[in-house]
Amino acid sequence: DQNACSSPHLIVWAGKINEIRRQKFWKTLSNLVKLKYQAPELSSVDKYHKFCSDLIKLKDLNSVKIYDNCVYTLKLKKFSETMENLRGRWGYFYEFETKNINSISKNINRKYQTMTYFGFKKDTLKKFIISNNIKGIDRFVPVGSALDINFVWDGYDLFKSLTRIIEVK
């Protein structure tokens, strides 16, 4: 449903862009959604309403693609400072292409919580975080691990936050 804080809304394609692989990704996702997910009827109306609204409001759209009404993708021309306000639901995604992942760093703020990644080495991500002084994104996790919970969540040590220490002297 893409309603959780860990749900994907934006896909950033970084590096050398392969259009065939990108299309294959979206088609595979659409086919998987058709096989494994029964969306409520209202979701189609909500998704189409969002789509029409975005077509009117968003001035930096590069292209749009609809995959069997299961997946909608809106490719953006730029990674703007208000990107975190773009929220997709019911198989509705925004996407952005960049040759260099560092280009998105200046617009990442504290509203970003989790970045799931595929095709990046941990050292590359660490360099991205340190060299760009990233102010947001508390978790960088591989695709498929966004719901994994640990003692540190969204930058907070849950164990310390949810326990108290009683001192007797």
Predicted regions and their residues:
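NAD(P)-dependent aldehyde/semialdehyde dehydrogenase
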Residues: 1-116, 126-167
